[in-house]
A protein has these predicted regions:
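Active-site neighborhood of phospho(di)ester-bond hydrolases with catalytic His/Asp-centered motifs
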Residues: 63-65, 86-87, 190-194, 219-222
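Catalytic metal-binding/acid-base residues of hydrolase active sites
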Residues: 32, 68, 160-162, 195-198, ...
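Active-site-proximal beta-strand elements of phosphoester/diester hydrolases
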Residues: 23-36, 99, 112-116, 152-162
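His/acidic metal-ligating clusters that form di-metal
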Residues: 137-159, 166-206
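Bacterial Sec-dependent N-terminal signal peptides
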Residues: 1-23
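N-terminal, active-site-proximal structural segment of metallo-dependent hydrolase catalytic domains
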Residues: 18-78, 89-97, 174, 287
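Structured beta-strand-rich core segments of catalytic domains in phosphoester-bond hydrolases
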Residues: 61-153
Length: 287
């Protein structure tokens, strides 16, 4: 009897370990750039809190938006187990905000990566390009990662759509969808970001309900087995009333995978917040 129990326990542990290896925790986190006018919530006051939040939730990979080079340095200094892919949007180097992807360097290998600008034609390859009616240059950073534990590879893209330009959001979303379709090489796809759009707005529908049904993104929240946290993700450091907070931050997927949970993380220390956006995290299991 003891042998049977031990065998069953061993089998359960092996199955649990196998499931854990296949699972990947992915986060999207608009960290809010450095603005002195933010007062209590300016970066120098919340950077340790933001880094500790990342240490606590331990995403395997996470995409950031609005991160300046100094913020990238600060985040990396606090997370020695991670590396990142990405560049600043102003010059393709360290100038301007990043839409970078951080990853656990012991677990993942970068097979390919790049950054492009959300702009028309050849402008997409020119650092600092403005697209359509955008107020700022907008970028997308992507990578093909190989999970060293499972041998599985997947395509990950992270972005931040413009907050002003209606055409820029619409055309930017189309560009993102087309790029993911043409560059993912049939691999599972994860797309994270601040899309500056709510679920029924045009940019989200471009991604989830395109005319060409051969490649469609799915909102991970809509298929998650467990949904935790509020609907809204942008709170402006707590200044927006809870019920009126818009949902702007998403984790989209395409391919053979299941979503174990999707959570909007509302951590705060009274009036001090890790950012003006809530981080969003999802646990995904590739089949």
């Amino acid at each position: 009897m003891k042998k049977l129990i031990l065998s069953l326990c061993a089998m359960f542990m092996l199955l649990s370990a196998s499931a854990a290896k296949k699972s990947v925790k992915i986060m999207t986190f608009n960290v809010r750039c450095v603005v002195e006018a933010d007062g209590l919530n300016q970066w120098k006051n919340r950077k340790d809190y933001a880094v500790n939040l990342l240490k606590f939730y331990k995403p395997d990979l996470f995409g950031v938006q609005e991160a300046t080079h100094q913020q990238m340095v600060d985040i990396l200094a606090g997370l020695s187990d991670y590396a990142y892919v990405g560049v600043g949007r102003s010059d393709g180097k360290t100038g301007g905000e990043y839409s970078a992807i951080f990853y656990e360097k012991a677990r993942f290998e970068v097979k390919d990566s790049g950054t492009f600008w959300l702009a028309e034609g050849e402008k997409a390859n020119i650092p600092g390009s403005l697209g359509w009616d955008a107020d700022y240059p907008r970028i997308a950073t992507w990578a093909i990662f190989k999970d060293k534990k499972t041998g599985k590879s997947f395509f990950y893209l992270n972005t931040h759509l413009d907050h002003i330009g209606v055409q820029a959001r619409h055309n930017g979303a189309k560009l993102l969808l087309d790029f993911a379709k043409s560059h993912s090489k049939g691999l599972p796809v994860v797309m994270t970001g601040d899309f500056n759009a709510e679920p029924t707005d045009d940019p989200i529908l471009v991604l989830t309900q395109p005319e060409d049904k051969s490649f469609v993104l799915t909102d991970s929240k809509s298929v998650s087995k467990l949904v935790y946290g509020p609907e809204g993700t942008f709170h402006d450091f707590g200044r927006i009333e809870f019920e009126k907070r818009p949902r702007l931050d998403y984790i989209f997927i395409n391919g053979k995978m299941s979503v174990k949970y999707h959570a909007v993380l509302t951590d705060n220390l009274g009036k001090l917040y890790p950012s003006d956006h809530h981080p969003v995290i999802a646990k995904i299991e590739f089949e």
